[in-house]
């Protein structure tokens, strides 16, 4: 088909007959065929079509079918750069705004993007149309747009791309534009909910490293890791820019929407009070997604319409996103809005609430939320938090959660921060609390790397006994306590050496030797069964694993116990 003649000729016929459907069908055929042509011919086609519809005589055609052409041109966006983007922008600005709005929302929801640029182009088109729509019920349009935005965003995040920064940027500015386009309370509330959804999606993909950056600001025993891991935060600058933009919108809404703080904290309190937690795989619920798929252009309704109709296309808060907003806001603004929320809604069960919350976040695949979980511990100032007896069990569960996170991650910076918060928190507790946690971990924890870490901590505590006047600390090396620990060693069945068990066994031998040189061991207390198992296994693995360190400590212990 010779489209150079067909396009203007068919346009003339369409004007005369007002048969815009036939003209639209012709353009669809031409654009579909051109998708297999070379890039130069595609570019020439898009430019030709753009120039044709820009002519004043074709204004009516443009207004009538722009919404349809956008869908036809979208596959060229990201391929025929500039020309396709400019054409979509022209169609959005000159087509019927309501029809353009509907079509672009539909395309966002359907997904199937080949590049992030298609997502960005559609969002720009929607906002262009939204600014030309006059309505008495703006919240209907805003809610439909936000549902479409997050459906499209969830789809585009499945694509591996270096352009995600631009995707986040346009998503943030889209919420901001919608907020300023219709500055009324109903739209403000919708945008407040949108902030929570965006925060949830953002942290499901990105990591702000708030916990590690907080650790770097301290001067403690973990400072030695600064030089080794100093490059870990090099990518945080761009993410900080995005995060601060989200928080700026959040703050604006908090200041302009009456009772907004109460609305968001009450929602979070209700969700946290529930016994179960449903993890969402996307930013909107299945009900909202179904609404989005079937959404029509919001028609003007008379004043007798019920409020129930308004809720048909309403987005909802994302609880994880709400909590993340308060946490991130606390980091950038040197406040503690997260702790303010806990004190306001859970004054007597702060630790229990944090333990429950962290247990949820730890189970998520997202490193971003794991980082948030650890930073929330810093916000609570766990190392100096006065733990009542009624919450000691929750403290233990919380620390076990952080320990589990440290053992299961391959990220050095996250492992460092998790272990740091556990150690610093234990140091601030009474010796009885510390000892209880140590024994519980050694007896019950199935993960050898966690048992290795806690045994190392126990060894350091034992070394403090001699120079300490603290009565409770002496229980760390009492005969009964050591007997319990050695029973754990002896109960270790089927000792087979591998990378993890090697570290644990090495730590047990170092621990025994440290007790021996402090004259805290006797023949009656020595874990003979365990020691014999280890000695036998080392001989079996001769040459297969680096066992020289184990042999060294076994020889030392043998010589001192003869």
Swiss-Prot record:
- Gene Ontology BP term (one): regulation of proteasomal ubiquitin-dependent protein catabolic process
Which subcellular locations apply to this protein? Answer: Cytoplasm; Nucleus
| Pfam families with a match to the protein in the record | Kinetochor_Ybp2 (PF08568)
Provide the residue span(s) of the region labelled Disordered. Answer: 288-308
Sites bearing Phosphoserine, chain numbering: 285-286
Stored InterPro entries: Glomulin/ALF4, YAP-bd/ALF4/Glomulin
Q: Which GO terms describe its cellular component?
A: cytoplasm; cytosol; nucleus
GO molecular function term, any single one: ubiquitin-protein transferase inhibitor activity
Cytoplasm is among the record's keywords:
yes
> What keywords are assigned to this protein?
Cytoplasm, Nucleus, Phosphoprotein
Stated family: Belongs to the UPF0649 family.
Q: What is this protein called?
A: UPF0649 protein C1442.02
């Amino acid at each position: 088909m010779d489209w150079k003649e067909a396009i203007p000729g068919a346009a003339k016929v369409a004007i005369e007959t007002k048969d815009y459907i036939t003209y639209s069908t012709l353009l669809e055929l031409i654009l579909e065929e051109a998708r297999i042509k070379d890039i130069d011919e595609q570019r020439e086609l898009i430019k030709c079509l753009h120039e044709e519809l820009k002519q004043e005589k074709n204004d009516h055609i443009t207004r009538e079918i722009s919404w349809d052409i956008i869908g036809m041109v979208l596959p060229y966006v990201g391929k025929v750069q500039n020309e396709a983007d400019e054409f979509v922008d022209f169609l959005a600005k000159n087509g019927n705004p309501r029809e353009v709005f509907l079509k672009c929302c539909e395309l966002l929801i359907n997904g199937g993007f080949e590049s992030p640029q298609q997502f960005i182009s559609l969002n720009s088109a929607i906002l262009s149309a939204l600014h030309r729509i006059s309505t008495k019920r703006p919240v209907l349009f805003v809610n439909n747009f936000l549902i479409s935005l997050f459906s499209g965003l969830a789809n585009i995040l499945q694509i591996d791309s270096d352009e995600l920064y631009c995707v986040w940027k346009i998503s943030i500015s889209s919420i901001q534009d919608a907020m300023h386009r219709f500055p009324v309370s109903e739209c403000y509330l919708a945008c407040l909910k949108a902030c929570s959804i965006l925060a949830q999606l953002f942290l499901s993909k990105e990591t702000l490293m708030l916990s590690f950056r907080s650790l770097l600001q301290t001067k403690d025993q973990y400072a030695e890791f600064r030089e080794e891991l100093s490059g870990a935060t090099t990518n945080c600058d761009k993410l900080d820019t995005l995060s601060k933009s989200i928080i700026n919108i959040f703050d604006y809404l908090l200041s302009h929407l009456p009772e907004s703080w109460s609305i968001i904290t009450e929602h979070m309190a209700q969700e946290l009070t529930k016994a179960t937690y449903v993890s969402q795989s996307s930013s909107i619920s299945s009900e909202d997604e179904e609404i989005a798929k079937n959404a029509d252009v919001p028609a003007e309704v008379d004043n007798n319409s019920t409020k129930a109709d308004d809720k048909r296309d309403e987005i909802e808060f994302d609880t994880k996103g709400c909590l993340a907003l308060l946490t991130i806001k606390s980091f950038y603004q040197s406040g503690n809005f997260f702790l303010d929320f806990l004190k306001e809604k859970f004054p007597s069960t702060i630790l229990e609430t944090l333990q429950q919350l962290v247990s949820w976040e730890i189970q998520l695949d997202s490193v971003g939320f794991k980082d948030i979980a650890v930073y929330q511990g810093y916000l609570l100032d766990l190392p100096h938090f006065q733990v009542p007896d009624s919450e000691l069990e929750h403290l233990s569960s919380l620390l076990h959660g952080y320990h589990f996170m440290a053992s299961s991650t391959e990220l050095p910076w996250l492992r460092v921060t998790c272990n740091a918060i556990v150690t610093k928190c234990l140091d601030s507790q009474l010796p009885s609390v510390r000892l209880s946690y140590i024994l519980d971990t050694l007896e019950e924890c199935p993960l050898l790397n966690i048992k290795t870490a806690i045994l190392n901590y126990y060894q350091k505590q034992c070394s403090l006994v001699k120079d300490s006047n603290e009565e409770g600390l002496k229980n760390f090396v009492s005969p009964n306590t050591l007997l319990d620990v050695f029973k754990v060693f002896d109960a270790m069945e089927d000792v087979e050496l591998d990378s993890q068990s090697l570290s644990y066994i090495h730590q047990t031998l170092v621990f025994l030797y440290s007790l021996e040189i402090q004259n805290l061991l006797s023949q009656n207390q020595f874990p003979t069964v365990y020691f014999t198992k280890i000695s036998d296994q080392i001989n079996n693995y001769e040459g297969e694993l680096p066992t020289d360190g184990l042999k060294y400590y076994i020889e030392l212990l043998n010589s001192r116990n003869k």
